[in-house]
Amino acid sequence: MRTELISIPTDGVPLDGALHLPDGQIKGSALYFHGNTMNFYTGAARFLAPAMTAMGWAFLAFNRRGHDILTTRASRAAEGGAFQTVAESVADNRYAANWLAQQGYSNPVIIGHSYGGMLATRHVVDHPNTPALVLLSAGRGGQENVSGGRENLFAMDRTQELTDQAKALVAAGQGDALLSLPGWWWVISARSFLDRLQHVPDTLALAQQIRCPVLALRGDQEDRTRYPAEEFQAACAGPCEVRVMPMCDHFYNGCEEQVAKEVVTWLGRLQQL
């Protein structure tokens, strides 16, 4: 495997990433969308790269502007997931796809983990020539599924209280002011908080417009209501296969090899059709 660190231009901050290439002939390409507060070098972005390149595929993983929780770049200005908006996330995925096409890899398979999977459904609907979609623990999305659950996410039982605080800050021109959350991901700007309540893609609604083959995977330790692979399969307009991985959490800790095998085996079968 050969890895090239790359930079993708946008209308603002460039996106860092890694293009992983096989040593031999390139037989396909895939574009990976990371989840909330993650990045191009952790989780599935990391463990899928050697598996994908071993089967002869180019594999691009990149940071959206909303990567990690908080970060800095070439200044002391704060950036990262605490400030992300859905529109910016959708745009960043489009920038990455366009960059990959400019390298000669048009219409890649799309792979998304968690929030990246939710964004992947939006991307595939907007790019109907996508040959296949892999959803790794994609969330339900939509306006009714933003907090709580057994994983203690986001605002938990303080959604209304924090919504009122965020609205007051935005109205005062302080949309970038940070709020502490009682659950993961712990810190978020007022503007980003309100944006998430309103604009996160509705995965199941978008499934009705997706006709390419889909693999929907999740761990058996995950909340099947929050990560509804079976419901996505039922709603999907095209063929969809579901895999529930045993002894497996949301980040696939200890199950990396098995998850990678499921993904490349499924993609390999598609190549033979």
Could you say what each language-model-derived stretch is?
Residues 81-84, 88, 129-244, 249-264, ...:
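The alpha/beta-hydrolase serine catalytic core
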Residues 1-24:
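N-terminal cap/lid segment of alpha/beta-hydrolase-fold proteins
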